[in-house]
């Protein structure tokens, strides 16, 4: 891994349907996956299969028959912060395989995103993920 890549900013475009994530300076996103969180419909149905309490993205999509799916972003606006946090966690640790505290983070937001939502995004990035720097850009 080159020195530039180690400190490259992370860019995350949170869409209502798909989440796109990668590194600033790259030609294309490294990860594109559905913006969904799934939870088992029935407890115990997957006993012995290493059942998790939630699944994100493609894994949730592939197990949708036994999961209740939720879309935490509606019309570009985050409506479920716990699930959104799960999507960001999945983005950093599973898709990009980075430590968010080592990279500046750029997130996109919908043009009509309420100020309170921007504040909540900022709070989660700094307090939960310990991002060293954070910027919110309006989706164009």
Curated annotation (Swiss-Prot):
SMART domains per UniProt: ACTIN
Catalytic activity: ATP + H2O = ADP + phosphate + H(+)
Main location as per UniProt: cytoplasm
Molecular function as annotated in GO: ATP binding; hydrolase activity
Key words, A-Z: ATP-binding, Cytoplasm, Cytoskeleton, Hydrolase, Nucleotide-binding
One Gene Ontology cellular component: cytoplasm
Pfam families attached to this UniProt entry: Actin (PF00022)
EC number: 3.6.4.-
PROSITE patterns listed in its UniProt record: ACTINS_1, ACTINS_ACT_LIKE
Cellular location(s): Cytoplasm, Cytoskeleton
Disulfide partners: none
Matching Gene3D superfamilies: 3.30.420.40, Actin, Chain A, domain 2
Chain's role: Actins are highly conserved proteins that are involved in various types of cell motility and are ubiquitously expressed in all eukaryotic cells.
Family classification: Belongs to the actin family.
Protein name: Actin-1
